[in-house]
From Swiss-Prot:
Pfam families: OSCP. The keyword Cell division does not apply. F-type ATPases have 2 components, F(1) - the catalytic core - and F(0) - the membrane proton channel. F(1) has five subunits: alpha(3), beta(3), gamma(1), delta(1), epsilon(1). F(0) has three main subunits: a(1), b(2) and c(10-14). The alpha and beta chains form an alternating ring which encloses part of the gamma chain. F(1) is attached to F(0) by a central stalk formed by the gamma and epsilon chains, while a peripheral stalk is formed by the delta and b chains. It comes from Thiobacillus denitrificans (strain ATCC 25259 / T1). It is a peripheral membrane protein. This is ATP synthase subunit delta. Its main location: membrane. It is found in: Cell inner membrane. The gene is atpH. Signal peptide: none annotated. Gene3D superfamilies: N-terminal domain of the delta subunit of the F1F0-ATP synthase. HAMAP family: ATP_synth_delta_bact (MF_01416).
Length: 178
């Protein structure tokens, strides 16, 4: 995962700088997210991985599927990624772009993963606590993972707050072993 992160970083930073220069962070966010969704499709992923399909054909297909909203600079971005065999990095590029965008906007991105579905009131309480702790606005994505058994794990910035039963059990097992 860190290799993908390392490879994607210069592309994410380049797109971010371009978006800032154009004063269009929201537009580029939408474009990069769309491209990440397209390359995540199983059929497109197979085409990208097929050495018999020329890189320029794959780029043309992706630009075509993305539509007019991509624009000339977006199409050029796809062509650069394709020529450098980096199309598969688009989901990670999108993630890093969103992190850079949130930083520029003064917000933090957080993912709350709980063992069970959270009510809106519970999510609002967690967001209020995170805002108070970090003194910044927080954008939240919520996910459910029954393997946590109970509680929740919050990933915000480069921090992880593990309040799950699974995490507590793992920490107890580690303490008993050491």
């Amino acid at each position: 995962m860190s290799e993908l992160s390392t490879l994607a970083r210069p592309y994410a930073e380049a797109v971010f700088r371009m978006a800032q220069d154009e004063n269009d962070l929201a537009g580029w966010s939408s474009r990069v997210t769309t491209l990440a969704t397209i390359v995540s499709d199983t059929q497109v992923a197979r085409l990208i991985a097929d050495p018999a399909v020329p890189a320029d054909r794959v780029a043309e297909l992706i630009v075509s599927v993305a539509g007019d909203g991509l624009g000339e600079r977006g199409a050029n971005f796809v062509k650069v990624l394709s020529a450098n065999d980096r199309l598969t990095l688009l989901p990670e590029i999108s993630t890093q772009f969103e992190t850079l965008k949130a930083g520029a906007e003064g917000t933090l991105e957080a993912t709350i993963t709980s063992a069970q579905e959270l009510s809106q009131a519970q999510v609002d309480d967690l967001v209020a606590g995170l805002k108070a702790k970090f003194q910044r606005a927080v954008n939240v994505q919520v996910a459910v993972d029954p393997e946590l058994i109970g509680g929740a794990v919050i990933m915000i910035g480069d921090q992880v707050i593990d309040g799950s039963v699974k995490g507590r059990l793992q920490r107890m097992a580690f303490a008993l072993q050491g």
